Amino acid sequence: MALSGLGSGPEGNPNNHQGKAIPTLNPSHGQGPSFLFSWVSFLVPFWSWYPFSPLPLKGIPGENSSSPNGLKNFHGIGLNGTERGMGHFHPISGNRLGLRLTLVAGWFLEPFPTFLAVLIRTQGDSTPSRSFVAFFVGTLGLGQEGITGSFNRKIAGPATIDPQDWAMEEGVLTNFLWPPFTTFFRTTKGFPVQWHGEGSFVVPGIFSLPQPLPWWLLLPDTPTGAGKPPESRQHQPSHSMNGAIVDIPGGLTQTPSSPDRSSSTNSIADEEKKLDYKPTSPTSDTEKGESLPLTASQSEIIASPTFSEMIRVIFSGPTLVLGACYFCTFGAELSINSVLGTFYQRQLGLGLQNAGNLAAIFGLLNIVMRPLGGMASDLLYRKTGSVWSKKALLHTYCVMTGVFCIAIGLARSRSQATLVGLVSGGLAFFLEGANGLTYSHVHPYANGVVSGFTGACGNLGGIVFAIVFRYNSLDYSKVFWIIGAIIIGLQVATCWIKPVPKSVI
């Protein structure tokens, strides 16, 4: 991917209108709007969800009298709601209704339970608000789905990692800005006492209100899938998938003639090598952007799966590996983010603002560490040409995440330099890098099912690890090494699974 592509409009594939470069600095051309609004759509909903978790003890007066265990129960409610939302929205978007309509519907409803947080007075009041916010925030992963539908699979990895990076900075927004918001409502005359903490939820709610408009008014549906626009379909007049999931590249009965057949063959061989696939017949040239008279690239068409096909995809070995790894990394990130400020307060004796500033560093490093993970994966793949090498790197990152969790838990350090170094240095590097590595393995042909399952596993990990924090609320150091042991154990259990399904070989 050339740097010149960052500011220019990307070349598009005429068969499916997918961009072949990332127009990071040119959001007005080609797939630029899709890229821009995808990461914004990840950030703003998560910003509504996130403040419930890390700062309730100091931020919401109605919850100040709650027990720490009760607060962690509500954190679990939030994670469970997000998991349910992702499980519903991803398959609907990727395989049935289409991305645009699903996003517009979810985002239209999401601000209302966010505004309901202003009415929180007791623990019971926070339950419906937290649950419904979390459910609609399940749309946050659809930004990733929009990327894989709008860009060529060769750049789907970096195109997906960048938006998730920037969107995860909502943790930084919360830790840096929530204490000042709370202070503003507390010190400004005219605001009732109950607004001192809950009033801050008005801010992400206001930002959420205009979210559906760009997708509804400016953007088409994703170029592939059930909701693809007419101009994409007209290039594929005779395609009929009969509702079945299409296999990744296989033999085709007809291929176009080309004066430069040798270069096309070399390109095909490179793509086949990525899947460790040995062809028995010619393969499509769609990846080169050449028009095909009778068929399209099988690997880039998203079909509506039957229930049995969805089950087969979910329980395939590679999908389970993705789910297990994301369970470890994203689950750990969610749960650790929710207690990190409190952990720093206890271990280092800091106030709310200073502890929040240090905790924000962990989230801020997402913007660097996730791309580094994806870049390391790409570099290793170029050197080896084997998908196994990418899988081995993913497991290595996950194991090192577990090692640093165990180190933090056993060290019980009260030195600010040591503790912040372990958390924001070693742990952030491997944990957030592993999050970037995970999504580079998602197969586009079953995008909605695979990404929905993987995202749900990440939230399930957050629930499980939050439960561990809940039952060890007085000893967070112990929880760190327990989480580390779980992560390492899951890597040992899944490291032997092949990265490519047998049906594709």
UniProtKB/Swiss-Prot annotation:
Residues 255-267 have a biased composition (Low complexity). The keyword Plastid does not apply. Glycans are attached at N64, N80. Keywords: Cell membrane, Glycoprotein, Membrane, Transmembrane, Transmembrane helix, Transport. Signal peptide: none annotated. It comes from the Eukaryota. SUPFAM superfamilies: MFS general substrate transporter. It is a multi-pass membrane protein. The chain crosses the membrane at residues 35-55, 313-333, 348-368, 391-411, 417-437, 449-469, 479-499. The keyword Transmembrane applies. Induction: Expression is induced by the presence of the cluster-specific polyketide synthase PKS1. Expression is up-regulated in the presence of large amounts of glucose, during nitrogen starvation or at alkaline pH, conditions highly conducive to elsinochrome accumulation. InterPro entries: MFS (IPR011701), MFS_trans_sf (IPR036259), NO3_transporter (IPR044772). It is found in: Cell membrane. Its main location: membrane. GO terms for cellular component: plasma membrane. Residues 1-25, 221-295 are annotated as: Disordered. Residues 1-10 have a biased composition (Gly residues). GO terms for molecular function: nitrate transmembrane transporter activity. Belongs to the major facilitator superfamily. Nitrate/nitrite porter (TC 2.A.1.8) family. Major facilitator-type transporter; part of the gene cluster that mediates the biosynthesis of elsinochromes, pigments consisting of at least four interconvertible tautomers (A, B, C and D) that have a core phenolic quinone to which various side chains are attached and which play an important role in fungal pathogenesis. Once elsinochrome is synthesized, it must be exported outside the fungal cells, which is probably accomplished by the ECT1 transporter, to avoid toxicity. PANTHER family: HIGH-AFFINITY NITRATE TRANSPORTER 2.3. This is Elsinochrome transporter 1. It comes from Elsinoe fawcettii. The lineage of its organism: Eukaryota, Fungi, Dikarya, Ascomycota, Pezizomycotina. The gene is ECT1.
